[in-house]
Amino acid sequence: MKIEMKKITKSFGANRVLEGVDFTVESGEVHALMGENGAGKSTLMNILTGLYQANSGEILVDGQPTTYSGPMEAEQHGISFIHQEMNNFLEMSVVDNMFLNKELRTKFGLMDNKAMREQAAHYLSLLGAKLDVEQPIGNLSVGRQQMVEIAKSLMTDAKIIIMDEPTAALTETEIDQLFGVVRRLKEKGVGFIYISHRMEEIFEIADKVTVMRDGLSITEYATKDVTMKQLVKDMVGREIDDFYPDRTPDHGPVAMEVKGLTENGVFKDVSFTVHQGEILGFSGLMGAGRTEIMRAIFGIDKYQSGEILLDGKPVKIRDPQDAIRHNIGFLTENRKDEGLILEDSLHDNIVLPSIDGFVKHGLVDDKATDEFVRMLMKRLTVKAMGPDVSAGSLSGGNQQKVVLAKWIGSGSKVLILDEPTRGVDVGAKREIYDLMNELTDRHVAIIMISSDLPEVLGMSDRIAVVYEGKITGILDGKTATQESIMTLATGGVEEHAGAI
């Protein structure tokens, strides 16, 4: 199958989203689609699969002009779209999710459960996934759920599979497994459209890459013929000479010290310090316990023993309100469920942790909060029509800036950032890195959890590595390497691991 999208345009009201986009993909290749959030990637794919209709342009499938009335018709013709946010019914079984609205029936019109179980197991086995198909799909890891989505695509005889940020929540092992499946299916003639912000993945898995910017298809390359620097330039419209900004850390006294923090079965004897003006990276494999440690420090989860000191004084943090009172902020890895109230305005989200400071005589000073929010939005260059728009209407990068604004506005002296640039485009990443440097210049202590090793190495002054709930070593950011981090992250011993 060969799909050619030619001169595709699309407007929503007065907003022109696509401006004459060209894109081609064929069976047996992986074609990456890159661009900043808002570049038009999702809109283009939604036009291909029939969710939207283009205003002009044409789609050719094997040379024939084609349009689909919706995703179901596109799927029937061999085009499958696996979205970043998988729409599984978590309490239903794997097999029931796979055959939802496509149930097999006996000649008597009854549900053929045996045939559905056998087919589900068969298509999963083609991917090397041996699963109990009668268990609830919610029991599976995100990586396993993704395998189920790919198996569903194969059931519909997909010739082209669209994958949107497929590795965003996967472990390194699951990413390796996913890439193995993609390569095997490619050899069997399946084509992939691979949407991702992760540069290193593009060079590992893609044969071609198309870059979009501001609703235009800017360039197409064979991956072997292009550099990361060129792709970044094409995406943002300018050169970013140094992807990670230079840091000239000026560390002050210890802002926070953690001693012997323990929660049985989750983490054990965790001890570390972070100084004013420092970025302390936390690295480790997914499931190592990094997020759980920070949730305990912030008062979301309980711990059995250990001590937290701020500015040298022991503090009791029983819940997040205690943490906020002690000037600790926490940007969670799941900003949509925990960091923001998506249906609420930017104003209400940003002012939430600081609202007590704006109450006079029992009433909120609306004028003061409005000025406060506008100042923070300007300072963090939040791209939005104004403070009254909903948080859910913003791109991922701007949502992340709103969460940062919330904690900066609350006067956080210790700021925990859990996967601060996950799902964020390359231009917004650089803006977030610059903000982190600006905060440390103001003596804020930052703890950054990241699964992106280049990010950890590029931004951290020191790097704490966690393995099975324990800190196995702390490395100097200047001398650490991916190899030294992975040695500690897999339980090995690194001779240059320094003091806690």
Swiss-Prot record:
<dbReference type="InterPro" id="IPR003439">
    <property type="entry name" value="ABC_transporter-like_ATP-bd"/>
</dbReference>
<feature type="binding site">
    <location>
        <begin position="35"/>
        <end position="42"/>
    </location>
    <ligand>
        <name>ATP</name>
    </ligand>
</feature>
<keyword id="KW-0067">ATP-binding</keyword>
<dbReference type="InterPro" id="IPR027417">
    <property type="entry name" value="P-loop_NTPase"/>
</dbReference>
<comment type="function">
    <text>Part of the ABC transporter complex RbsABC involved in ribose import. Responsible for energy coupling to the transport system.</text>
</comment>
<dbReference type="Pfam" id="PF00005">
    <property type="entry name" value="ABC_tran"/>
</dbReference>
<dbReference type="GO" id="GO:0005524">
    <property type="term" value="F:ATP binding"/>
</dbReference>
<feature type="domain" description="ABC transporter 1">
    <location>
        <begin position="3"/>
        <end position="239"/>
    </location>
</feature>
<keyword id="KW-1278">Translocase</keyword>
<dbReference type="GO" id="GO:0015611">
    <property type="term" value="F:ABC-type D-ribose transporter activity"/>
</dbReference>
<keyword id="KW-0677">Repeat</keyword>
<comment type="subunit">
    <text>The complex is composed of an ATP-binding protein (RbsA), two transmembrane proteins (RbsC) and a solute-binding protein (RbsB).</text>
</comment>
<dbReference type="InterPro" id="IPR050107">
    <property type="entry name" value="ABC_carbohydrate_import_ATPase"/>
</dbReference>
<protein>
    <recommendedName>
        <fullName>Ribose import ATP-binding protein RbsA</fullName>
        <ecNumber>7.5.2.7</ecNumber>
    </recommendedName>
</protein>
<dbReference type="InterPro" id="IPR017871">
    <property type="entry name" value="ABC_transporter-like_CS"/>
</dbReference>
<keyword id="KW-1003">Cell membrane</keyword>
<keyword id="KW-0813">Transport</keyword>
<dbReference type="GO" id="GO:0016887">
    <property type="term" value="F:ATP hydrolysis activity"/>
</dbReference>
<dbReference type="GO" id="GO:0005886">
    <property type="term" value="C:plasma membrane"/>
</dbReference>
<dbReference type="InterPro" id="IPR003593">
    <property type="entry name" value="AAA+_ATPase"/>
</dbReference>
<keyword id="KW-0547">Nucleotide-binding</keyword>
<feature type="domain" description="ABC transporter 2">
    <location>
        <begin position="246"/>
        <end position="493"/>
    </location>
</feature>
<keyword id="KW-0472">Membrane</keyword>
<keyword id="KW-0762">Sugar transport</keyword>
<comment type="similarity">
    <text>Belongs to the ABC transporter superfamily. Ribose importer (TC 3.A.1.2.1) family.</text>
</comment>
